Amino acid sequence: MKTTDKVLIGIVIGIVLLIVVALIVTLAQPEPAYQTEDTPEGVTYNYLLALQREEYERAYGYLSPTIKGYPASAEKFIEHIHVYSWNFRLDTDTTLSVESVKISGSNATVTVRESRFRGGDLFDSSQSTMVFDTELHLEDSEWKIIYSHYYFASCWVREKGCK
C-alpha cells in the first residue's frame, strides 16, 4: 500500500470517528427538566420550557391573573399563541437559559438568553443570540409572570386584552 493511500485512509477514519463522537455527545445530552416553582427563575424557566414542549395549559398557569388582558381560559391562551406566533418564536430551534435574577420585595426581573439556530450551509451556523427580561410578581406565595419582552402577547397588558 502506498503512503498516500495510508494517509487518505487515516483521514477518512478520523472524519468517521469525529462524526461518531459528535453523534454520541448530541444523543447523550439529557432532556431539559422542569425546575422548582418557588423561585422567579424556576417559574420563568418552566414557563418557557412548557411553551417549547407545547404544554400550553401548564404554561398558562404561570401567568398572573392580575394582567389587564389576562386570557380568560387556557383555550384563549393557546389561540393567542398561534395568532401572535411571531412573539412566541416557536418556529425556530432555540435554546433558552436564565442569565440573572433581580428580586426587589414582591417583584422580580429574570433575564433570559435566547440562542436561535437556523439551517445553513456547512460553514454558516446562522446562530443569533439575544437577551430579554421577564417580569414576575409574588402573589399568594407564588411567583407569577406579569410581562415578558418575548414569549408573551403584548396585548395582554392592555385593558381590553387581545381581540
Question: Residue ranges of each PLM-predicted region?
Answer:
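Short, low-complexity N-terminal intrinsically disordered segments enriched in polar/charged residues
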Residues: K2-R53, G61
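Alpha-helix initiation/capping motif
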Residues: K2-T4, E55, T66, R89, ...
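Mixed-charge, polar/low-complexity N-terminal
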Residues: I24, P30-P32, T36-D38, G42-V43, ...
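Short solvent-exposed beta->alpha transition segments
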Residues: N46, E57-R118
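Broad hydrophobic/π-residue packing in well-ordered secondary structure
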Residues: Y47-L51, Y60, K76, T134-L138, ...
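Exposed beta-sheet edge and beta->alpha loop/turn motif
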Residues: S100-K163
